[in-house]
């Protein structure tokens, strides 16, 4: 978990997608995040966490539903949302916190 904590302290935004393999909306979100990753390049990191395999992290960040995305900047949570979101909206949120 210390590698994860170090990653969150990154000066560029880090989007963490808390999801599960059995989750339908998580499967809908996957291509959106892949598209976003190709658009934003190295300006932000996108990480997927399986809540069933990483229960400790899910509990630490109080994940009650999946998918839940949390955007971190300099180790702090700056945005959070549960559910599927449009790629352009998500891109705008990341760009807003990239400055």
Labelled PLM ranges:
Residues 73-99:
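Non-catalytic, surface beta->alpha helical segment in thiol-disulfide oxidoreductase systems
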Residues 11-12, 18-22, 65:
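Short pre-active-site segment immediately N-terminal to redox-active cysteine/selenocysteine motifs
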Residues 15-16, 46, 69:
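Hydrophobic beta-strand anchors of alpha/beta hydrolase catalytic cores
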Residues 62-70:
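Structural micro-motif
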Residues 1-13, 55:
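A short beta-strand-turn-helix
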Residues 51-57:
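Structural microenvironment flanking redox-active thiols in thiol-disulfide oxidoreductases
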Residues 27-39:
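Typically the conserved alpha-helix immediately C-terminal to a functionally engaged Cys/Sec
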């Amino acid at each position: 978990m210390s590698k994860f904590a170090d990653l969150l302290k990154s000066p560029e935004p880090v989007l963490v997608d808390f999801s599960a393999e059995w989750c339908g909306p998580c499967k809908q979100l996957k291509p959106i995040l892949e598209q976003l990753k190709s658009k934003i390049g190295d300006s932000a990191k996108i990480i997927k966490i399986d809540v069933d395999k990483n229960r400790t992290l899910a509990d630490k960040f109080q994940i009650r539903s999946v998918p839940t995305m949390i955007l971190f900047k300099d180790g702090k949570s700056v945005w959070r949302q549960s559910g599927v979101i449009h790629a352009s909206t998500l891109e705008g949120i990341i760009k807003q916190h990239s400055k």
